[in-house]
From Swiss-Prot:
InterPro entries: EF-Tu_GTP-bd, EF-Tu_GTPase, EFTu-like_2, EFTU_2, G_TR_CS, P-loop_NTPase, Small_GTP-bd, T_Tr_GTP-bd_dom. Residues 81-84 are annotated as: G3. GTP binds at residues 19-26, 81-85, 136-139. Residues 10-204 form the tr-type G domain. It comes from Rickettsia massiliae (strain Mtu5). Its EC number is 3.6.5.3. This is Elongation factor Tu. HAMAP family: EF_Tu_B. CDD domains: EF_Tu, EFTU_II, EFTU_III. Belongs to the TRAFAC class translation factor GTPase superfamily. Classic translation factor GTPase family. EF-Tu/EF-1A subfamily.
Amino acid sequence: MAKAKFERTKPHVNIGTIGHVDHGKTSLTAAITIVLAKTGGAQATAYDQIDAAPEEKERGITISTAHVEYETKNRHYAHVDCPGHADYVKNMITGAAQMDGAILVVSAADGPMPQTREHILLAKQVGVPAMVVFLNKVDMVDDPDLLELVEMEVRELLSKYGFPGDEIPIIKGSALQALEGKPEGEEAINELMDAVDSYIPQPVRATDKPFLMPIEDVFSISGRGTVVTGRVESGIIKVGDEIEIVGLKDTQKTTCTGVEMFRKLLDEGQAGDNVGILLRGTKREEVERGQVLAKPGSIKPHDKFEAEVYVLSKEEGGRHTPFTNDYRPQFYFRTTDVTGTIKLPADKQMVMPGDNATFTVELIKPIAMQEGLKFSIREGGRTVGAGVVTKINN
């Protein structure tokens, strides 16, 4: 069946369902599509179709993820749902599914459980900006006092991990009732989508952020100077703009004297473009792959940071043995590898393949870095882990 193409006139937001196993994430995802399909905002997608999530590879890591899309009056959404807990951990750490916001699903019958906590913590670590709560399975709870208690617990948990627990909208409903077409079930879904529309902030578009381009290659063109190539990650670069070359060495200032794409000269390059940028007065040997071009003052080089990391299992082609303190692999940032030393927290002796962990890293050379930057951990050319910078330490 051909997919109906959505008109992309509305602002776009990436979202996902998170929460403990069997609390109803996939049922809720199905219910959203089925309720919104009635007003033409989605293609109704059954639970089984979402649950049979295809496997995808992101930086050598196998992740099962289901994608659905739908729209409300105000926005167009791409929604991710994962079948297993490990898939969430991998997804959030690798950024395979970029989330501008999340719907935390908590079963009213069980209250917050271990993975509820872990997903809230992960969301905080990887920088998910906001979340809305769906208190599911309320049809199984007869006592209103119990519902109130669960809601209080959820709010306390959110506050504990740095989310505004008192402000976050909590919608009570039953995904099952919505799937069965019961009016109270559908009403809760509509209420949830209104909350998501109003509470999850509109993400800043890549072109509105400061200019940043990771350098992939450097050429010398006789009579014209040095050209660096790469894909613009964010912002816009115009001919005549002053820029900085950041990372690996001391930061240098230069000016962009030309932008070209597909051998044509342009006035500007913007986020998503693969461009060549001509640099005034910069020698070929002063620039290298792994540095970035950036708007002056927008990003700094750092060599010490804290990270949340997923370590590949043996089956995924990762290590067969755990690693301990002072492990020294390569950290692959954007376009290059830098050696670094891992310092584990005092209470952790080792990290097992298939685990996720928080630890500190010290690189031998600084990299242009900001919180939220993703990286891979490599050993002898193969990927053994994936991580995200959660805090910069120097």
